[in-house]
């Protein structure tokens, strides 16, 4: 486990052996950080958020309560392969949002660019590629393998079918 000396971890948080926590990061009460997770500098993980899987969050990201970041893909073809979720810098992942890792058949990586806002209850499916400065409004569902370019705004309660670019 690599926890920078300036990181603050609440006593009730559960940070698994092997996790990497960057400088000046904060892990809140009852948050869970998995063993393969890498958090950049100044990342804030609020109460009850879960970050797991082979997941990387860039510098200055914030994750709100009850978000689930880096869980395995919702794909019946997934059988435990080493796949990843990479989130860029300065992203905001609001409460109840879900972001899945990739699948072997889809390239193995779900990617979220820099300066992205993922609002409450939104979902980013396996192997999705989300550009920079994207906003996913409340309860948006981005299915597997979707590609969103830079500066996209998806309105609330919208669904984007898998493989859409």
Predicted features, each with a name:
Residues 2-165:
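Structural signal for interior beta-strand "rungs" in well-ordered beta-sheet cores
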């Amino acid at each position: 486990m690599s926890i920078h000396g300036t990181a603050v971890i609440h006593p009730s948080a559960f940070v698994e052996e092997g996790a990497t926590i960057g400088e000046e990061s904060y892990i809140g009460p009852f948050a869970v950080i998995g063993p393969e997770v890498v958090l950049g500098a100044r990342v804030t993980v609020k109460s009850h958020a879960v970050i797991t899987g082979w997941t990387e969050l860039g510098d200055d990201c914030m994750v709100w309560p009850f978000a689930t970041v880096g869980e395995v893909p919702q794909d019946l073809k997934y059988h435990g392969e080493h796949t990843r979720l990479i989130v860029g810098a300065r992203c905001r992942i609001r409460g109840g949002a879900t972001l899945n890792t990739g699948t072997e058949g889809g390239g193995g990586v779900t990617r979220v660019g820099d300066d992205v806002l993922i609002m409450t209850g939104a979902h980013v499916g396996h192997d999705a590629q989300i550009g920079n400065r994207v906003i996913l409004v409340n309860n948006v569902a981005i299915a597997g393998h979707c590609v969103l370019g830079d500066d996209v705004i998806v309105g609330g309660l919208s669904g984007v079918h898998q493989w859409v670019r």
